Amino acid sequence: LILIPSRLSASRLPNKPLLKINGKSIISLVVDRAKRSKLGEVIVATEDNKILNEVKKNGGNAIITSNKHKTGTDRIYECLSKLKKRNIDYIINLQGDEPNIDINDLKRLYILTKKNNSDMSTLASEIHNKKIYKDKNIVKVITNLKLNKNNFPYAKDFRRLITSGKNIYHHLGVYIYKVKILKKFINLRQSENELSNK
């Protein structure tokens, strides 16, 4: 199951999900990519009727959620709780503003997470442009090991601004959780680091 949290009231770029790229809304492009991954049903979780209508108009599925959520994770959990009982092991949380997400990366994330029986995983990529380190609009992840296809490091920290260090990567905003872990995760108190890096 791929759940896509999406809302119009983003602080950095309001109405972003409905902006068009080559005549198609960003949210519709994200839904199309998610469907092409063939990793399961794709549902957009949104508080906005405009997004709901846009998704449905383009053949997608969406569910209205509360407008009180502090995070996309809270939003997808509400969406999950509204779905009828299903046999789901993992939930992929794909951000609604990632129209260029690589389908193969989504597949690798699922395969590696399942193979390693991990409770939760996320995607990151190498940083090739040094300006990204100082760009507060791009979240960076610091890992315990150098990232490569042969290891599965864990995230030590997530930061918006960072000037130096090693094992720093561009966080791609895609998560996968075991359903039981998602249920535990949303009940945790937000850390100071999470609140300061929003």
Each model region followed by its residue ranges:
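Short beta-strand segments
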Residues: 5, 93-95, 123-124
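Donor nucleotide-sugar recognition loop
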Residues: 189-198
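N-terminal glycine-rich phosphate-binding loop and ensuing alpha1 helix
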Residues: 1-46
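Short phosphate-binding loop-to-helix
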Residues: 43, 49-111
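Conserved core of the sugar-phosphate nucleotidyltransferase
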Residues: 101-190
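A conserved hydrophobic position in a structured secondary element of the catalytic/binding core
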Residues: 46-47, 101, 177, 196
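Short, high-confidence coil segments that cap the C-terminus of an alpha-helix
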Residues: 39, 85-88, 115-119
